[in-house]
Structures are given as C-alpha cells and as structure tokens.
Design a protein with these regions (language model features):
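Sec-dependent N-terminal signal peptides
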Residues: 4-15
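Boundary at the C-terminal end of the N-terminal hydrophobic targeting segment
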Residues: 18-20
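Mature N-terminal segment immediately following signal peptide/propeptide cleavage
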Residues: 23-51
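Conserved beta-strand position repeated across blades of beta-propeller domains
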Residues: 32, 70, 126, 171, ...
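Short coil/turn segments that connect the beta-strands within blades of beta-propeller domains
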Residues: 35-36, 74-76, 130-131, 175-177, ...
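A flexible loop/linker signature enriched in serine peptidases of the S9 family
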Residues: 42-47, 61-66, 79-91, 95, ...
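Glycine-rich phosphate/pyrophosphate-binding loop
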Residues: 312, 317-323
Length: 489
C-alpha cells in the first residue's frame, strides 16, 4: 500500500509539473467576466477559465471565428458573434457550454472581416437584460463607417433598433433608463493618437427625456463605456497610452485608474464585480472593490492544426511580376517569397525560401545580373540584392532604416538603387561602396515619384509643398544639389 501511495504521489507531482511548465497563452482576445468565470476568444474559438488562471476549457470549435463573448446579467448565458452558418451573426450559448443558438439573421456584407479596419458586422456589445442582447450592425447603413445599435431577443424574435442614429460600444445604467455609448466605432483602426473629427467621446442618452450629454469632452479617444453603480468606466489615450478611467455621475469627477505605458488596454468588458481586458496579449481583470488589476495566467492545450506546415499553391497568391531584361525569365512575389519562373521551359526556383520573413518588391537590375528586393529578416525593412540565379547568399545593402520602405528604382547602369520611405525621404545607395546619400526630405507629403536619367547622373522627383501642391526637382549626383524644374503655384 505504501508503494502504491508513493507511486500515486509521484504521478501527481509530474502531472502538476507538466501543467505548471505549460507555456502561458498569449494573444487572447475580447474577454468577458462574470464572478470567477472568464471567457475569451483564442485562435477564433471561445475558451473559458477561472479568473485565478489555469488550464482553459474550449467552448466552441466552428470553422469560422467566434468573438466578443458577453455574459448575461445573471451569468447563465454567453452571447457572442460567430460565423457558424457562413454569415456573421449573433449567437447564444449556455455559460458552461452547449449547442449555440442563432438569434439574428442579416444579409452578407462585402466588408465583414475581423481584419478589416471597419471590424466585423453584428458585434455583440452588451446585454440590456437577461432577455435582450445589444449588438452593433451595419445592416441598415450605406456607409461602412456607420452602424446602429439593435436589441436582439434571445428567443429569436425580430431585432429592434435602439433610438440612436449611430452607435458603438455601450453600457446601460443600473436602472436601464440611460445608455452610455460611443457614437463612432473605430476600435479596429491601426493608427494611434488620433484627435480628429472621428475621435470619440462617451455620451449618455436618457431614454425618457431623449437628451444626450457628453461626459468626457476630450480631444483624445474616450471609448468602451462600462456603467457600474454611479460610475462610468472607460478607456482613454489622453495620456498617450490607453488606460482605464472612471467618471462619477454624481460628482462628475474623472479619475485615471491604471498606468500602463507600454501596451494599450484593449477591448475591456464589464462583469458583475470586475472589468477584464487585454494588455500585451495577456488578460487582466480590474477588481471594482479594491480598484486593483490582476493578471489571469492562462494555459491552453490545443492541437493548433492551422499552424502546421502545409502545401500551398503559390500561383494563387502572386502579388507582383517582373520580366528579366532578356525576357527569358520572370520573378514573382508570392506568400512572402520570391520565385524565378522560365518564360517558356525550365526550372522554377524559390530564390529566398525563408520562413517568417516577408520579401517583396523584387525587380531585375537593368543588366540582368541581379535581383533586388525589400525584406524584413532583421526586423526592419531593408533592401537586398542577390544573384539572378540565386546561386549565392543575398547581400544586405541598407542597414537600420528604421521605417517602412515604399519601393525603389534601379539606376540604368545597375550601380545604384534609389528608394523612398515613410520618413518622407528620397535616398540612393552606391552598390559597390554601400554608401547611402540622402537626396531630399519633405516637410509635407511623401516623395514617392522619382525617375533616373538615362545616364544615371540625375534623379527627377516630385516634392509636395505644405499645401500638397507638387513641384518637379532635378538632383545632380555629381555635385549633390537639387534644383526645381517647375514653377511654384
């Protein structure tokens, strides 16, 4: 008996060790919380885990994505946006798991994708009560920027529009008589620090008086209102990084509650006693009683079938093609690699054969000896050249560019390459010496239009003025000076 007990203890020890050594999951999206239960989207499926962390349990496994889960007020049901039937619709599922039930039916949109900057259609926002799910839909809008808020009965009845012309993320007051909401929806945009006309505020709409009040009134992005008691919580980047703030509806006092300075808080949601959110790909919950954040350390056991090596037909993903000067071969860009293909007969070659590296903008040198391309093997955009047949390792020409390179142009003598970048610069490099020379830098728009002279001694380019009116300039490589070739307006 003692030996059996010892064996069991050893097995339990190694099992616990295996779980403890399981790598912590990252890139968990769109979390929700109720009590001790957390639900989130990972690799397009829904998972649930205790807020203390641990091994997550998978709730959904459909081919499409399941995103934006939200607990009902009683915590018994999860509403989410899914693609079980091809279209993006609202579904409900028991909080402990089960068969999803579809509760909305809308027409398919041309722009309905998780990666689209407009975001997907029919996103679950919140619940009004245990019988109605609030979702944002573009089904009535002619403009991809605009969407309205709708109530979907959980019994599958017809949805009704909340009486607002447009709407984004929102939250009801505890008595259900008011709604804190964003008028604009731009949470899927890819740029930061926006403060223009579409920078949003948090507004409160009174269903009785029909009045709307701006409670943030700030040039920054104030988004994701979450109403709990007398306090409306929201995100703001008024201090450059998205952090959690609160607005007390009784005292009209605004407080900053978190102090992240690296990654933004993203996609928070309100539970019964906590707010959960993404930060740097991890999950954290903010306890409303103690006003403190806690990380949820999650492990996920999944086969990750989609990440296994697969055979792909590169011909279906060609993004550019350039024939050789003699017309005998063509270089194609596809799936981040560069291919050399014979015009009539011969061998097709993958010239780069890199994994996890994006090579693009491939082109032949005018003499046909070299192929140049832009690659990010170093983590930055750099310009490379390689022998036309791929017989030698590529040569990295530029170093530490630190920005995005739009494209480049070979000089007719095949001795230099000019390029422009997101820093609004036009530069060229001497291939033999590797010396980089800056031709010009704009204070206004980008310098994307430029051409070499036939003798490779001049560069002609257009440069925008402050009013975006362009002039043509000529740059002499010998004396390194530019002069305008056209008049100012």
């Amino acid at each position: 008996m003692k030996r059996i007990f010892t064996t069991i203890c050893v097995i339990m020890f190694f099992t616990a060790s295996a779980f403890s050594q399981q790598e912590e999951a990252r890139l968990m999206r769109f979390p929700a919380i109720y009590g001790d239960q957390v639900v989130f989207s990972y690799a397009g499926d829904l998972f649930t885990v205790d807020k203390s962390g641990g091994l997550a349990r998978q709730l959904t496994s459909a081919e499409g994505v399941e995103i934006f889960p939200r607990f009902s007020p009683d915590g018994q049901t999860i509403a989410f946006t899914g693609q079980y039937d091809g279209n993006t619709e609202v579904f409900i599922i028991p909080a402990e798991g089960g068969v999803p039930e579809r509760i909305t039916y809308t027409a398919t949109l041309s722009r309905d994708n998780l990666s689209d900057r407009m975001g997907p259609n029919n996103i679950v926002m919140t619940w009004k009560d245990n019988d109605h799910v609030v979702y944002r839909s573009r089904k009535k809008s002619f403009n991809d920027f605009q969407g309205q808020l709708f109530l979907a009965p959980v019994d599958g009845g017809i949805s009704t529009q909340i009486p607002l012309p447009t709407g984004g993320f929102c939250s009801y007051s505890p008595d259900g008589k008011k709604l804190a909401f964003n008028r604009v929806f731009r949470e899927f945009r890819t740029w930061k620090y926006y403060s223009g006309g579409m920078a949003d505020d948090v507004w409160i709409y009174d269903f009785d008086t029909k009045e709307t009040v701006n409670i943030t009134n700030n040039d920054a992005q104030d988004i994701f209102p979450m109403w709990h008691g007398d306090v409306v919580y929201f995100l703001s980047d008024r201090d450059r990084t998205m952090n959690l703030f609160s607005y007390n509806t009784a005292t009209q006092e605004t407080k900053k509650l978190t102090n992240y300075d690296n990654f933004d808080i993203k996609f928070p949601s309100l539970g019964d006693n906590a707010i959960i959110y993404e930060n740097g790909g991890y999950l954290y919950y903010f306890d409303l009683a103690t006003q403190t954040p806690t990380k949820v350390e999650v492990q996920i056991m999944k086969d990750f079938a989609a990440s296994r090596p697969q055979w792909k037909d590169a011909s279906k993903s060609i993004n550019s093609a350039y024939p050789s000067p003699d017309g005998k071969r063509v270089v194609f860009g596809s799936r981040g690699d560069i291919f050399s293909v014979p015009a009539s007969s011969g061998i097709t070659k993958n010239l780069t054969k890199t994994s996890g590296v994006h090579e693009r903008n491939q082109d032949w040198s005018p003499d046909g000896r070299w192929i140049a391309y832009i690659g990010d093997a170093t983590g930055e955009n750099e310009i490379y050249i390689m022998k036309h047949d791929g017989s030698e390792e590529p040569i990295q020409l530029t170093k530490n560019t630190g920005t995005y390179i739009f494209g480049y142009e070979w000089s007719p003598d095949s001795k230099k390459i000019a390029w422009s970048d997101q820093e609004k610069r036009l530069q060229y490099i001497d291939i033999d010496s590797k010396k980089v020379t800056e031709v010009d830098q704009s204070n206004s728009g980008e310098l994307r239009n430029y051409e070499w002279s036939p003798d490779s001694k001049w560069l002609a380019y257009t440069k925008p003025s402050f009013e975006e009116v362009t002039r043509i300039y000529l740059y002499n490589l010998e004396n390194k000076t530019s002069k305008p070739a056209t008049d100012e307006w």
